[in-house]
Amino acid sequence: MGLQPKAKLYSPALLGLATGLAQYPFDPDLPLTAEARSRSCGSVIALGLALDESGRIARIGMRVSACAIGQASAALLAQGTIGAEPSRIAATAAGLSAWLAGEGDLPPWPGLEPLAPALAHPGRHGALLLPWKAAVAALSHGA
């Protein structure tokens, strides 16, 4: 019984998300870059973004050294980022923080459902937020 929550946390859907990260290689020449590091687990994410002429996100690249939760969260960020307005990234990051603090529902971002079991695992909250923090930091460099 003690292993059941862990099995739910690391579902096939969550583990499968990490394989999509190869589609978003980090490019140091992207104009908006940032790195985020977790103090609790040592995970590191380097992220780069480029905006199009209308100010929407046109490109994203990442280098992810994180646990399965961090990798899945990064993949979901990348999958929904192209064409998004920067304010949507910031709003989703804030929504995820609020949700993890028990102050709201999972924010409206495509495919976040596999991350839902992480709510019951506070030790994984930092890894889940890491790619979003990197994206917000990168976008703040373009403000």
Locate each region found by the language model.
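Structured beta-strand/loop patches that form or line metal/cofactor-binding pockets in enzymes
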Residues: 17-64
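Alpha-helical support elements that line or immediately flank enzyme active sites
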Residues: 73-85
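Short, thiol/selenol-centered motifs that function as redox-active sites or metal-ligating centers
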Residues: 65-71
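Alpha-helix boundary/interfacial micro-motifs
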Residues: 38-39, 82, 102, 140
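A generic structural motif
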Residues: 64, 82-83, 131
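C-terminal binding/interaction regions
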Residues: 2-23, 87-143
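A generic structural signal for alpha-helix starts
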Residues: 68, 84-87
